[in-house]
Design a protein with these regions (language model features):
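Gly/Ser/Thr/Pro-enriched helix-cap/hinge segments flanking short amphipathic alpha-helices
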Residues: 28-31, 39, 49, 366-367, ...
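Blade-edge beta-strand/turn elements of extracellular beta-propeller
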Residues: 32-35, 113-123, 163-174, 247-259, ...
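Repeat-based blade/solenoid architectures
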Residues: 41-63, 99, 121-133, 173-185, ...
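Beta-propeller blade termini
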Residues: 60-71, 107, 128-143, 157, ...
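Hydrophobic beta-strand segments that make up the repeating blades of beta-propeller
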Residues: 74-81, 140-149, 197-201, 281-286, ...
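Short, conserved, GDST-rich strand-edge loop motifs in beta-rich repeat architectures
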Residues: 80-98, 201-233, 394-411
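Beta-propeller blade signature
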Residues: 102-108, 237-244, 295, 352, ...
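Asp-box/WD-like beta-propeller blade repeats and closely related beta-sheet repeat scaffolds
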Residues: 117-137, 142, 148-189, 199-231, ...
Length: 568
């Protein structure tokens, strides 16, 4: 009887706790449902050990990409994969060819399901993949893919039909020896209409000589032995390749100044006009060190201005474990802001753009200091409820699976944290009322944002460590308007990468960047998405092309994809 009464009390307390939480949560018309399995995304993404990560190479995971590879108007899906180490050994596990882990390409069937076309597309490859960036580097109309690895990076040229050729060597991008490629971005550094390529290198790592967990000062966390690094491991340098327009890339890392920025552990790289001068800059989130903002000097060289711009450290002046980047205009002032995700016991940085290349970290003032026990990875500033303000979603997952057995506060698997944008002033945590797609725990890394089903709202695809990917369908239930802008460059690169699109509707001004990489090691829908609230039309669409040209359209009807071709 006492047991039954105690059970009733526990049940009542649980109900009261749920009711109190639910009552306190703001009204939120968005529910995320993970439809990955129903959509055909059933293959687990292999990445390192299940219950223990012996070496840092097993921890970082990889990105995903939403990209229309076959030009049918529907987003296809690339999920990067790692592999495993042999038990007790310092080498990759052996697999039969048919069973070997591989990155996978899924073709959108346009009916809510995807077909695995990995082999047909020519991208089967086993290894420790990191990041993907996308763009039409040869301006032939097909989106090409660049994938970084621990080992050898790969450039896949799109044949135009969603199949690919590995052209790494003939493009001049084959590297000697083993390097750990991390973030990358296609970027037109010199306004010649050709996409150049920025590539970050995380650190120098030798599996044969790597220290065991607990074997040094940088091999424990909260007194518990864990895999070593990144602190204490040697750093590497970043690379910049100039597109020569003949199918090859030329290494200009030294003369451009990119390789001169040293002593960092760079991760995700996002390229856009962050300083507002019409030239494309590169922002790099760095792990455990100051982040980098490469300002384009307009002469083929770059200077790191992260410290003076306010984007190197957090609001307390500390370096953070920078993982992912979300770029967008959260306060609707027409300027591109930045969110940078971090490690447990920290909060995201929210770099509010003040104009003229200056930023301030407004994370605490904006209400982002409420979740700090999770390791944060892929992130996106996307208007999930189409009310005209960019919301925030980031995925979580610890790098030490063994920790949760000793420290319950730091679970290996965590939620997808969702913040509603409250009119550009503050963010409100709505994770608990965003559906099982948000609250079900996973150890996630990359996330890509885009309209997978072409219904006018933003969905999310997520890389999960040693699980199948998640496909979060946005079940927005309201009637707010929207518009999407697809670009085709003529003087600029054909894919429009690096452009900033500004939409004005009813006095509300919103900016979005067209990015080759963002989130965590991932690539989003190239179509710029804008919520319009109660409005059905936009007063003006302004495109700031990477060529420097500014183009405007007026009085445009909403609820559709508007294609804008650059004027010559």
């Amino acid at each position: 009887m006492r047991a039954a009464a105690a059970g009733l009390v526990v049940l009542l307390l649980a109900v009261l706790r749920f009711d109190a939480r639910d009552a306190a949560a703001p009204a939120w018309p968005v529910t995320f449902t993970d439809v990955g399995r129903e959509a055909g995304l059933t293959r687990p993404t292999i990445y390192g050990g299940l219950d223990r990560k012996r070496f840092i190479i097993e921890t970082n995971g990889a990105g995903v990409a939403l990209v229309d590879v076959d030009r049918d108007g529907w987003l296809d899906l690339l999920v990067l994969s790692g592999t495993r180490l042999q038990d007790g050994a310092r080498k990759d596990a052996d697999y039969a060819p048919a069973d070997a882990p591989t990155s996978r390409l899924y073709r959108n069937r346009r009916n809510g399901t995807f077909e695995d076309v990995t082999d047909k597309a020519g991208i089967r490859r086993t290894g420790w993949a990191s990041a993907v960036c996308a763009g039409d580097y040869d301006n032939d109309g097909g989106i090409d893919l660049y994938v970084t690895y621990f080992g050898r990076n790969v450039l896949y040229r799109n044949r135009g039909d969603g199949t690919f050729d590995d052209v790494t060597r003939e493009a001049g991008l084959a590297s000697e020896g083993v390097r750990w490629g991390s973030g990358c971005s296609f970027v037109d550094l010199d306004r010649d209409g050709l996409l150049d390529l920025f590539v970050a290198n995380y650190l120098r790592f030798d599996l044969q000589t790597a220290a065991e967990p607990g074997a040094g000062a940088n091999c424990t966390w909260k007194g518990i032995p864990v895999n070593c690094g990144p602190k204490g491991l040697p750093t590497d340098t970043n690379l910049l390749y100039r597109n020569d327009g003949k199918g090859r890339f030329v290494d200009v890392s030294e003369q451009s100044g990119v390789a001169r920025v040293t002593g960092r552990y760079p991760m995700t790289a996002a390229a856009a006009d962050f300083t507002g001068d019409g030239w494309i800059d590169v922002y790099v989130a760095c792990d455990s060190t100051a982040s980098i903002l490469y300002r384009n000097n307009k002469d083929g060289t770059f200077t790191d201005i992260a410290v003076e711009s306010g984007t190197a450290y957090n609001e307390d002046g500390n370096a953070q474990a920078g993982m992912g980047i979300a770029a967008g205009d959260y306060n609707n002032d027409g300027l591109l802001d930045l969110v940078k995700t971090h490690f447990a016991d920290d909060i995201p940085a929210l770099y509010r753009n003040l104009g003229k290349g200056l930023f301030e970290d407004a994370a605490t003032a904006a209400g982002l200091n409420v979740q700090n026990r999770y390791v944060e990875w892929g992130a996106g500033l996307s208007d999930f409820d189409n009310d005209g303000f960019a919301d925030l979603l980031y995925v979580t997952g610890n790098v030490y699976p063994e920790i949760e057995q000793l420290l319950e506060r730091y679970p290996h698997r965590g939620p997808r944290v969702v913040f509603r944008n409250a009119n550009g002033a503050r963010f409100e945590d709505v994770t608990a009322v965003s559906g099982a797609g948000a609250t079900t725990p996973h150890s996630s890394r990359g996330a890509a944002f885009g309209d997978i089903d072409n219904d006018g709202d933003t969905d999310v695809v997520i890389m999960n460590m040693n699980e199948p990917p998640s496909l979060l369908r946005n079940g927005y239930s309201g009637g707010n308007g929207w518009i999407q802008v697809a670009l085709e460059g003529r003087t600029s690169n054909r894919s429009g990468i690096g452009a900033t699109v500004i939409v004005t509707a009813g006095g509300v001004r919103q900016a979005r960047a067209v990015l080759s990489q963002s989130s965590y090691y991932s690539h989003d829908d190239l179509r710029a998405h804008f919520g319009l609230g109660s409005r059905s039309r936009v007063d003006e669409i302004e495109v700031r092309w990477p060529s420097g040209q500014v183009q405007r359209l007026e009085n445009v009807e909403g609820r559709k994809v508007v294609k804008i071709v650059e004027e010559k």
